[in-house]
């Protein structure tokens, strides 16, 4: 029953946001369950699963494929974590302790005492270009984001 209440609440929120034409922040999109890494063509598939009602919000959260094709690949990234706090972030812990980090060219795992998990994307000069917090990301979101931003060595791992 609580799932139905949540869906009704979500639908009313979507209708309100759509009515005002509000642009959603990437954080708001994540809280609604949408990844900003999704291509807008994914939103078009929602109708096949009887989810057409959430399509307007999906469209506000997605990236146009044109932008994705011309996306910038960063030469490197640093994933900073604290070894003692890693257990509080099981999704990040699962990613760090798996073989997945080896898939990404230029990805370094750096253990920084007391640090919450954060990803630092580096430009050609080694300066921080983007610094998204990954506190609430799951393992798949981290992997998907890195596959969009870094060169991938081997996807067979």
UniProtKB/Swiss-Prot annotation:
It is found in: Endoplasmic reticulum lumen. Keywords: Endoplasmic reticulum, Selenocysteine, Signal. Residues 1-19 form the signal peptide. Expressed in the brain, liver and retina. Localized to the retinal ganglion cell layer, the inner nuclear layer and the outer nuclear layer at both parr and smolt stages. GO terms for molecular function: oxidoreductase activity. GO terms for cellular component: endoplasmic reticulum lumen. Gene3D superfamilies: Sep15/SelM thioredoxin-like domain, active-site redox motif. Belongs to the selenoprotein M/F family. PANTHER family: SELENOPROTEIN F. May be involved in redox reactions associated with the formation of disulfide bonds. May contribute to the quality control of protein folding in the endoplasmic reticulum. May be involved in retinal development. This is Selenoprotein F. It comes from Oncorhynchus mykiss (Rainbow trout). The gene is selenof.
């Amino acid at each position: 029953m609580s799932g139905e209440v949540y869906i009704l609440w979500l639908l009313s929120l979507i209708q309100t946001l759509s009515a005002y034409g509000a642009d959603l922040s990437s954080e708001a999109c994540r809280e609604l369950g949408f990844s900003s890494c999704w291509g807008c063509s994914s939103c078009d598939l929602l109708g096949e699963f009887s989810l057409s009602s959430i399509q307007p919000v999906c469209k506000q959260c997605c990236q146009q494929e044109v932008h994705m094709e011309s996306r910038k690949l960063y030469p490197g990234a640093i994933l900073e974590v604290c070894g003692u706090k890693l257990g509080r972030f099981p999704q990040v812990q699962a990613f760090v302790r798996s073989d997945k980090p080896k898939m990404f060219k230029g990805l370094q795992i750096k253990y920084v005492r007391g640090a919450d998990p954060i990803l630092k994307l580096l430009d050609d000069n080694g300066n921080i270009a983007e610094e998204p917090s990954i506190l609430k990301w799951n393992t798949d979101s981290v992997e998907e984001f890195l596959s969009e931003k870094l060169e991938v060595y081997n996807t067979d791992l």
